Amino acid sequence: MPQVDPELFDRGQFQAELALKSSPIAAFKKAIRQFREVLDNRFNSGRDIRRLIEDRAWCVDQVLQQAWQRFDWGDDADIALIAVGGYGRGELHPYSDVDLLILLDSEDQESFREPIEGFLTLLWDIGLEVGQSVRSVRQCAEEARADLTVITTLMECRTICGPDSLRQRMLEVTGSTRMWPSKEFFLAKRHEQQRRHAKYNDTEYNLEPNVKGSPGGLRDIQTILWMARRQFGSLNLHALVREGFLVESECSMLASSQEFLWRVRYALHMLAGRAEDRLLFDHQRSIARLFGYEDNDVKLAVERFMQKYYRVVMAISELNDLIVQHFEEVILPCEQPVQIQPLNSRFQLRDGYIEVTHPNVFKRTPFALLEIFVLMAQHPEIKGVRADTIRLLRDSRHLIDDEFRHDIRNTSLFIELFKSSQGIHRNLRRMNRYGILGRYLPEFGHIIGQMQHDLFHIYTVDAHTLNLIKHLRKLNRPEMAEKYPLASKIIDRLPKPELIYIAGLYHDIAKGRGGDHSELGAVDAEAFCQSHQLPLWDTQLVSWLVQNHLVMSTTAQRKDLSDPQVIFDFAQLVGDQTHLDYLYVLTVADINATNPTLWNSWRASLLRQLYTETKRALRRGLENPVDREEQIRQTQTAALDQLVRNGIDQDDAEQLWSQLGDDYFLRHTAGDVAWHTEAILQHPDDGTPLVLIKETTQREFESGSQIFIYAADQHDFFAVTVAAMDQLNLSIQDARIITSTSQFTLDTYIVLDADGDSIGNNPERIAEIREGLIDALKNPDDYPTIIQRRVPRQLKHFAFAPQVTISTDALRQVSVLEVIAPDRPGLLARIGGIFLDFDLSVQNAKIATLGERVEDVFYITDARNQPLADPDLCKRLQAALVEQLSQDNGRDTLPTRINF
């Protein structure tokens, strides 16, 4: 513990303060406030963090001793005040709990009831956050035997007041010879760690990690030390060096990593003003500045700070794996004779774990640094890597240099891993964990731990990349065919599956360099393929996939797939069925690996539609594209056949169709045209809007809910409709607006419920939506109030200036208004209100929400059904939209852009 430090706590001054005051509470509070201020100032000036948290524990010791002495415990009383847990280790952060054990020799607590109650009340009154228990030595033993948490807490203890003999007796009766022998304790702690990691999705790379509990956090270091304490009776990292579980460099790395996390945790407590171990968005920017990071042209300060954080916790995880594996080999020796199974002259299995046959294997044959992972892919029964071999891998990474990277033995081994029938993701992840992957591919090393400060990308770039490969592997499993029917079918017939894994590995490799990462990554991918002797066609395919990996998703979500020109342009880009197949599968995996919430039934259906229409265009031949008239004729013929079968008069149908215009038949399928036509012809002419609701497809995982509205047109129709849908808690994904020559509107909205799923076959919910929309449209003057829902906490920290762009589509005679803005509750309804104010009509809309941002496209016309031609009107419209969308934003606005 620290030496006496009068600046932190001066006993003489404190006693004088007590003598001057009638109540001790003020003196105690002043002393606590004083040492907190001094320690926080020392932290801000960069003082050693280990000393700071030890000093804080020492200060609390002084306060507790002074408080304890104010009560009469009797002469030679068998009662002691014991510090346990983190405080027992002598470590205390600004708002950490002060964990105390009041330890008695006897279970008869009655004689001490009054002073104990007075003591604890005083601690409460002076503002100390304490966690306390009152137990006898025997009770400690009973509870420790039954509870892993209790035995762990009691292992870390020291006496603050009273006889230390009580603590010694307690340690004796709870020692490993009496309970929780090291084997049992190790198994329980390992299981506890596995459960804790699972709670955080088994990744160090959560967007808002818990500095204490997430994988690679402080608890992982403490777990190692607890295991060591139970086995060896030692409780510090240097003891692990003496016992041969760590080498000095690893010990130093763990110690420096621990100190980094301590500084982060200390800063979190200071900024939050309370105990806070979550590195929330609220604090990430502030801590980045506190740690001296600044924005530059390529990365934000917060991204650079978080990359440092992620690399630290990844290093801790790597060493935690190594040490826990080493403990397992020592603490859990196999009761059966050791089973040795040779694999080749370099590797063998020992009780199911792979190890080198000689300590100099990697030095003599460096290619074995890659071979070990290929062997594990070929032998999926291998449980893992022996601890000594993990250390040899770590210590031999320097052997991977340019000569190594261009050696045909090594390039062949790496490609062989991608051709494995299983284990690709698992072993790439191992390569990353042991530092081999980033060493072999320096471009991959640059993206390790690199985050993107948004809600769209919830993983670091390297974690996302490996998740993508994991998802590609999952698509091969039969059980995935239900959720991903098309992708599962396609991936099975890819001629060279290894190419899509290579493209997946490289698709985001150039993130964080500035510039277009797709273009830069394509160059890197081409260089990789060439250095690994891939044929020209394979090289060109991989490079093309990396360059275009975003195109299919962007086309599906932002363009009108009913437009034959959109399909033709995309078909020209892909060129053939093989490129289309590879790109579709890569796109599905990329979306799922970016953020699981992004993949919903509507996005799935859009991608399927784009894939299917493009496949049809390729089969027809790019030299023979479908023209608009042919598509309209095909749709009408198929719809009419269906209507006639249902008893609808052909003349009535054609009379209705004559009022609709070409766009209607281009934007809807024959089935939808028949559905709409039959319902309209049978709908009573009483002014009540017609509202139809059905699923877009019967495929469970590739669907949205289609709401069709037929009613007399009115200038506020879109605004009223989207506001009503907002009130009904519906998320609009797509809108198609048609106005007939008879001034009726035929609007189709694709919606999802708040949970991201389609409405489904829920009669009560369907009735609620239908009635709500009819009521709103029958009473448009009672414009639905936009619901003022609370902006989620996370969204508040990703505010940016809205961007509004207006251009003209001369072919379709509409203005294209693009909005990029922070996502907010009721945002689409707000936009609809602005359109109403400017007397604008919406012809079509594509809605996309990407994490914390929306990227919406509206095809609009003015009151004369013409594109917006007045520059002044466009500027006023932009200004109104930016002002509305900037509410609750907290950021200055950016310039907008008009392209005529």
From Swiss-Prot:
Q: Which cofactor does it need?
A: Mg(2+)
Annotated region (Uridylyl-removing) at 343-705
Q: Which GO terms describe its biological process?
A: regulation of nitrogen utilization
Renumbered residue ranges of the record's region Uridylyltransferase: 1-342
- Answer whether the UniProt record assigns the keyword Hydrolase to this protein: yes
Q: Which GO terms describe its molecular function?
A: [protein-PII] uridylyltransferase activity; phosphoric diester hydrolase activity
Residue intervals of the HD domain: 461-583
SMART domains from the UniProt entry: HDc (SM00471)
EC number(s) per entry: 2.7.7.59, 3.1.4.-
Look up keyword Heme and say if it applies. Answer: no
Q: Kindly give the InterPro entries that the UniProt entry links to this protein.
A: ACT-like_dom_sf, ACT_dom, HD/PDEase_dom, HD_domain, NT_sf, PII_UdlTrfase/GS_AdlTrfase, Polymerase_NTP_transf_dom, UTase/UR
Query: What are the ACT domain coordinates in residue numbering?
Result: 706-789, 816-891
Notes on the domains = Has four distinct domains: an N-terminal nucleotidyltransferase (NT) domain responsible for UTase activity, a central HD domain that encodes UR activity, and two C-terminal ACT domains that seem to have a role in glutamine sensing.
From the Swiss-Prot or TrEMBL record, give the protein name: Bifunctional uridylyltransferase/uridylyl-removing enzyme
This protein's encoding gene: glnD
